[in-house]
Swiss-Prot record:
Protein keywords: NAD, Oxidoreductase, Tricarboxylic acid cycle
Protein name, entry field: Malate dehydrogenase
GO MF annotation list: L-lactate dehydrogenase activity; L-malate dehydrogenase (NAD+) activity
SUPFAM superfamilies: LDH C-terminal domain-like (SSF56327), NAD(P)-binding Rossmann-fold domains (SSF51735)
PANTHER family membership: L-2-HYDROXYCARBOXYLATE DEHYDROGENASE (NAD(P)(+)), L-LACTATE DEHYDROGENASE
Gene that produces this protein: mdh
Family: Belongs to the LDH/MDH superfamily. MDH type 3 family.
Binding-site residues, substrate: 81, 87, 119, 150
Active site: 174 (proton acceptor)
Length: 310
C-alpha cells in the first residue's frame, strides 16, 4: 500500500505521521512545493519509528514522479483560513491549486482513491473529480467526519460523559450551512433530546457550525489540523482495511435526497474501493430542506469555476 499526502503543512504532516504510526501503508510520501519542508518533516517522522514502533517508509519530495502508483492520495494543499475569512473566500485561489495538483498526480497514478481536505471542501472535491476523470466512488471529501467529531465532542463536554458513547453525524456542505441531524443523535442509545433542552441543543448545533472559525480565531494565523488530520486518516483506515464503515462524507449524489450532480455530505459506506453505497436516511422536512439549501450553495460556487475547469 502506497499513500501520498499532498501538502506538508500542519494537516498534511500530521496526517502523514498518523498514517505511519497506524501502519496503514508500507510507503508514505509527503509532497510539497517548498523545497526542504517535506524532506525535513518526513525524516523527523521516520526517526520516530523506533519509538512509535512502526516500519512504514516515509519520505518527502517536491517531485510528483515520486507519487507514482499511489493507492490513496490525500490532498491538503491550499491556503488556510485566517480570522474573518469564510471557506468560500478561498474558492478561486484553492481551486487553481487543487486543479494543478490533481492534473499532476493523475500523470503518475492511474486509479487512486482521492481524499480531499482542502477548503472549501465540497467544491474542491468537485474540482478534483472533474479534473481526475476518476469514477465518483474514488473521489471523496472529508467533511462530515470532522464536523461530526466536533458535534460529538461538544455534546460529551456538555453532558460530562465519554465521547465513546456519543453517536452523531453532520450532513451537508462543510461550512456554515452544514446540517447536524439531531434526531439521530444519541448517548449510549438515549436520544439527545431526552438529556438536553432544545435551547442547549441549538447552542451546540451553532457551535458545531462555527467550530472551524472558533479555532481560527484562537490561532490568529492558521486553522485546525489535529482533528482534520485524524478525520481524514479515519477514512483512509476504512479503505485500507475494507471496514465497510458508515461515515458522513462528501460524495457526488445522483438523485439521492432529491439532489443530483453535486458533491455534498451524506452517510456513505466506505471500503477498499472507496464509496460503496450512499445511504438515504429518513429526514424530516426541515432537515431535508436544509440539506438541499446547503447543496445549492455548493452548486452555485461550482458554477463560478466553469472557465477554470474547461
Amino acid at each position: 500500500m502506497k499513500i501520498t499526502v499532498i501538502g506538508a503543512g500542519h494537516v498534511g504532516a500530521t496526517a502523514a505521521h498518523r498514517i505511519a504510526e497506524m501502519q496503514l501503508a508500507k510507503e508514505v510520501v509527503l509532497l510539497d512545493i517548498v523545497e526542504g519542508i517535506p524532506q525535513g518533516k518526513a525524516l523527523d517522522m521516520y526517526e520516530s519509528g523506533p519509538i512509535g514502533l512502526f516500519d512504514s517508509k516515509i519520505y518527502g519530495t517536491n517531485d510528483y514522479q515520486d507519487t507514482a502508483d499511489s493507492d490513496i492520495i490525500l490532498i491538503t494543499a491550499g491556503m488556510a483560513r485566517k480570522p474573518g475569512m469564510s471557506r468560500e473566500d478561498l474558492l478561486l485561489k484553492n481551486a487553481t491549486i487543487v486543479k494543478e495538483v490533481t492534473d499532476r498526480i493523475m500523470q503518475y497514478s492511474s486509479n487512486p482513491i482521492i481524499i480531499m481536505v482542502s477548503n472549501p471542501l465540497d467544491i474542491m472535491t468537485y474540482v478534483s473529480y472533474v479534473r481526475s476523470k476518476l469514477p465518483k466512488e474514488r473521489v471523496i471529501g472529508m467533511a462530515g467526519v470532522l464536523d461530526s467529531a466536533r458535534f460529538r465532542s461538544f455534546i460529551a463536554e456538555e453532558l460530562n460523559v465519554s465521547m465513546k458513547d456519543i453517536n452523531a453525524f453532520v450532513l451537508g456542505g462543510h461550512g456554515d450551512s452544514m446540517v447536524p441531524v439531531v434526531k439521530y443523535t444519541n448517548i449510549a442509545g438515549i436520544p439527545l433530546t431526552e438529556l438536553l433542552s432544545q435551547e442547549k441543543i441549538d447552542s451546540l448545533v451553532d457551535r458545531t457550525r462555527k467550530g472551524g472559525a472558533e479555532i481560527v480565531n484562537y490561532l490568529k494565523d492558521g486553522s485546525a489540523y489535529y482533528a482534520p488530520a485524524a478525520s481524514a486518516v479515519e477514512m483512509i483506515d476504512a479503505i485500507v482495511h475494507d471496514r465497510k464503515r458508515i461515515l458522513p462524507c462528501s460524495t457526488l449524489v445522483t438523485g439521492q435526497y432529491g439532489m443530483d450532480n453535486v458533491f455534498i455530505g451524506v452517510p456513505v459506506k466506505i471500503g477498499k474501493n472507496g464509496i460503496e453505497e450512499v445511504l438515504e436516511i429518513n429526514l424530516d422536512t426541515a432537515e431535508l430542506e436544509a440539506l438541499r439549501q446547503s447543496a445549492s450553495i455548493v452548486e452555485s460556487n461550482c458554477s463560478n469555476l466553469a472557465d477554470l475547469l474547461s
